[in-house]
């Protein structure tokens, strides 16, 4: 399984759209794909015409198994949706032991070929979990000063994650 994180410290640069587009392409090529919304805005669900739901909250805070919280979009494409309850996920992770690896641990035995993480444009414990779980980080951006600054910030954070021993592919 490969894990891709879509990250930028700047909002509105195309993280969600990029994640949805890649997930669509992978699933159409029969690659079993899971999208996980780590953003409290819950835009991944909206991208598929679904209502926001507390899938991530149920997975992390209520310890429900992954297969109970996924929504199947179509064959080879599943979603763990997010909503405002994602803020509670951040608090739960903050109180946990080994908090930086919670997402990695939850995904360890996931039955997918690819997992795509849509990260919020913030730097918090959930964002860090996404970066640590990722094999690859995709940084969508626009050609403007604020978006480029967001790229610099995420690259700095990734370097810090690598200093702790994590290696991106």
Q: Over which residues does each language-model region extend?
A:
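P-loop NTP-binding core
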Residues: 1-169
